[in-house]
Amino acid sequence: MTLTKAEMSEYLFDKLGLSKRDAKELVELFFEEIRRALENGEQVKLSGFGNFDLRDKNQRPGRNPKTGEDIPITARRVVTFRPGQKLKSRVENASPKDE
């Protein structure tokens, strides 16, 4: 099962009594703020959850799997997520759900 933004909005609607429009806007604003911070090169720390970091990867040699031809993989910036200790602990201790 996958948790979607629509399901998050529905949860806020049910639990907090927000209108569906306000719940959807709150979820969108939350993720937009994370996107904005990362686009500006900032780290995002969510206490009790984890950190979103930016990492610069250097150019490196690669290979086309179909032709075997050597090709360079260009340098790029990637987003990484490191879960916090509380999240790690809760996930490790959670009982698995059947899908």
Swiss-Prot record:
SMART domains noted in UniProt: BHL
A GO CC annotation given for this chain: cytosol
Membrane in keyword set: no
Top-rank lineage group of the source organism: Bacteria
Keywords attached to this entry: DNA recombination, DNA-binding, Transcription, Transcription regulation, Translation regulation
PROSITE patterns, A to Z: HISTONE_LIKE
Residue span of region Disordered: 49-72
InterPro entries noted in UniProt: Hist_DNA-bd (IPR000119), Histone-like_DNA-bd_CS (IPR020816), IHF-like_DNA-bd_dom_sf (IPR010992), IHF_alpha (IPR005684)
One annotated GO biological process: DNA recombination
GO MF annotation list: DNA binding; structural constituent of chromatin
Similarity annotation: Belongs to the bacterial histone-like protein family.
Function description: This protein is one of the two subunits of integration host factor, a specific DNA-binding protein that functions in genetic recombination as well as in transcriptional and translational control.
Subunit structure of this chain's protein: Heterodimer of an alpha and a beta chain.
Record's protein name: Integration host factor subunit alpha
Origin species: Escherichia coli O9:H4 (strain HS)
